[in-house]
């Protein structure tokens, strides 16, 4: 494969994210306007984001594991890139799921909360690089077991945790303004 072709292929998942982002917010707004609670819109969005990604990455893992390197064809590459693009595209739903939760909880402190959670995510991301390399070495170079399936596993677990929490909206700023909550 030439460098120009691989460059084009590497941008496809991100283009899918941009395309889906144009659909996500209006769809979430229509769901809420149609009577779905904001909490349920957030949960649906996050479920689409994480479980969609988990399904796509599991399928990529299956294709990668069932295709020896010498048997990779153009169809194999197209299949993997399609699955990755769909998974990345579904990841755009995080913009009306998890990323909005901070604003729902406290508009006043949303930027601090988002910064804190993003910092923790960056630490986890840094550690994941180490663990991917470690798993890659102990699995004999198996990308499915060292990268795709662990990510899919954590996406499913994260979805379950997100769904289990009672997320009745609480406006902490309003409670603080009423004097029922002391400022730190």
Write out the residue ranges for each language-model feature.
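Multi-pass alpha-helical transporter architecture, strongest
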Residues: 60-64, 150-184
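Loop-to-transmembrane helix entry/capping segments in MFS-fold secondary transporters
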Residues: 3-4, 107-117
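Transmembrane alpha-helical cores of Major Facilitator Superfamily
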Residues: 11-15, 85, 115-123
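Transmembrane alpha-helices of Major Facilitator/SLC transporters
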Residues: 6-33, 49, 53-55, 124-128
């Amino acid at each position: 494969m030439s460098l120009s072709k691989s460059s084009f292929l590497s941008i496809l998942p991100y283009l899918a994210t941009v395309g889906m982002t144009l659909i996500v917010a209006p769809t979430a707004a229509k769901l809420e306007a149609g009577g779905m609670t904001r909490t349920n819109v957030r949960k649906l969005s996050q479920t689409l984001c994480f479980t969609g990604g988990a399904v796509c990455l599991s399928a990529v893992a299956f294709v990668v594991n069932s295709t020896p390197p010498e048997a990779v064809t153009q169809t194999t590459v197209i299949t993997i890139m399609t699955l990755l693009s769909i998974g990345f595209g579904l990841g755009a739903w995080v913009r009306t799921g998890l990323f909005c939760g901070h604003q729902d909880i406290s508009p006043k402190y949303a930027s601090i909360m988002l910064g804190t959670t993003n910092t923790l995510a960056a630490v986890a991301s840094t550690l994941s690089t180490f663990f991917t390399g470690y798993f890659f070495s102990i699995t004999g170079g198996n990308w499915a077991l060292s990268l795709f399936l662990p990510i899919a596993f954590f996406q499913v677990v994260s979805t379950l945790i997100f769904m289990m929490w009672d997320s009745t909206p609480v406006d902490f700023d309003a409670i603080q303004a009423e004097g029922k909550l002391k400022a730190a």
